[in-house]
Amino acid sequence: MAHLQELQRTDFEPHLHRAGAFRLSGEGLPEPVALELVEARSLTKADPGLRRQPFGLVFRGPREPVLPQRIYRLDNPSTGPQDLFLVPIRRDDAGTYYEAIFT
């Protein structure tokens, strides 16, 4: 498992738009929830003085249930399990979208 502090946006980009590449689990979830990474973006201009460039990830999950913001276990074969704070940010016909921010 990679350390959360060491993860970079580039660790996630190979999984963009791969349905089911991520599985969400956690307390209160009866079974894992499949997520698709739909966006990986830098949050600031590159700053060589920073240990890690801040970035954001947006995942799309099923339309129902809408999961509350909290820490979930996110599993992916290449990054390993990570405990991430996810926030629901929008919902449309395709699903519910969740954001994770890395600073």
Residue ranges of each PLM-predicted region?
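A general secondary-structure signal for short beta-strands and their flanking turns/coil
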Residues: 17, 30, 52-54, 95
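Short coil-to-beta-strand transition motifs
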Residues: 25-36, 76-82
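Short, conserved turn/kink motifs that form compact alpha/beta structural patches or helix kinks used as
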Residues: 39-75
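Beta-strand secondary-structure signal
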Residues: 21, 34-36, 56-58, 71-73, ...
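A short, sequence-level motif marking secondary-structure junctions
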Residues: 36-43, 87-93
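Short solvent-exposed loop/turn micro-motifs enriched in small/polar/acidic residues
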Residues: 15-17, 65-67, 93
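N-terminal disorder-to-order initiation segments that are Gly/Lys/Arg-biased
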Residues: 2-27, 34
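Short, compact, well-ordered microdomains
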Residues: 69-103
